[in-house]
Curated annotation (Swiss-Prot):
One of its GO terms (biological process) is translation. PROSITE patterns: RIBOSOMAL_L23. Part of the 50S ribosomal subunit. Contacts protein L29, and trigger factor when it is bound to the ribosome. One of the early assembly proteins it binds 23S rRNA. One of the proteins that surrounds the polypeptide exit tunnel on the outside of the ribosome. Forms the main docking site for trigger factor binding to the ribosome. The lineage of its organism: Bacteria, Bacillati, Cyanobacteriota, Cyanophyceae, Oscillatoriophycideae. Belongs to the universal ribosomal protein uL23 family. NCBIfam families: PRK05738.2-4, PRK05738.3-4. It holds the Pfam family Ribosomal_L23. This is Large ribosomal subunit protein uL23. Keywords: Ribonucleoprotein, Ribosomal protein, RNA-binding, rRNA-binding.
Length: 101
């Protein structure tokens, strides 16, 4: 399945920078928030096209939406999906995502 270049921006929302994600970077695994409708092959294709790297594997997590309350009104935060992408050794994605490091 070929994706249009306009669709690439919509699938990957942002990289995740947490303690766990930082530890995973040392193992050549990078964490991204992605569109909940995205599949593993779509995520792999997008990462390989945008960053020009070789993806070995992808693990995804569907995180639940959380209940939020403002005054007497109860609402929900939107649900989201997180992808942990494993790259081949020596791939230069870190320089693209974090140029200051």
């Amino acid at each position: 399945m070929k994706l249009d270049s306009r669709d690439l921006v919509d699938i990957i929302k942002n990289p995740v920078v947490t303690e766990k994600a930082t530890r995973l970077m040392e193992l050549n695994q990078y964490t991204f928030d992605v569109d909940p409708r995205a599949t593993k092959p779509m995520i792999k294709q997008v990462i390989e096209q945008i960053f020009e790297v070789k993806v070995i594997g992808i693990n995804t997590l569907n995180l639940p939406r959380k209940k939020r309350r403002v005054g007497k009104y109860i609402g929900f935060k939107p649900r989201y999906k997180r992808a942990i992408v494993t790259l081949e050794d020596g791939e230069p994605i870190r320089k693209v995502l974090f140029p200051d490091l």
